[in-house]
């Protein structure tokens, strides 16, 4: 059965997601969000993806903790700079860069395999 109107109203909105990211606690990385990421975030919301799952992964990264193996974090070879990718769900990915020198986490993009590649 599809999502009821009540269930849909409990979903985290894009605005709530951005506020939650801004107010994450116990983080060591400063989070920067690209415009591309924001546009892709809107698309993820329209696809009814659970933004809380994405927030939880980003919080783990911002704390400097390792992601669980189910997220399959790895670097991508196709970029000039080091870009990381992980799976939020099997066909929902997060792309980011991080610098340990300045402790900055840059959220580059999110979407499906076909969106990103």
PLM regions and their residue ranges:
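Conserved N-terminal boundary motif of the eukaryotic protein kinase catalytic domain
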Residues: 81-83
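Surface-exposed, Lys/Arg-rich phosphate-binding patches that contact polyanionic backbones
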Residues: 40-47
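Enriched for short, Lys/Arg-rich terminal
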Residues: 1-30, 36-39, 51-52, 56, ...
């Amino acid at each position: 059965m599809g999502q009821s109107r009540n269930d849909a109203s409990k979903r985290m909105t894009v605005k709530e997601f951005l506020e939650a990211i801004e107010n994450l606690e116990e983080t060591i990385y400063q989070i920067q969000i690209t415009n591309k990421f924001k546009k892709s975030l809107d698309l993820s919301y329209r696809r009814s993806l659970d933004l809380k799952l994405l927030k939880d992964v980003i919080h783990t990264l911002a704390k400097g903790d390792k992601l669980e193996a189910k997220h399959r974090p790895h670097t991508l070879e196709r970029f000039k700079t080091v870009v990381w990718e992980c799976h939020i769900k099997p066909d929902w990915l997060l792309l980011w860069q991080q610098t340990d020198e300045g402790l900055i986490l840059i959220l580059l993009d999110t979407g499906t395999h076909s969106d990103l590649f």
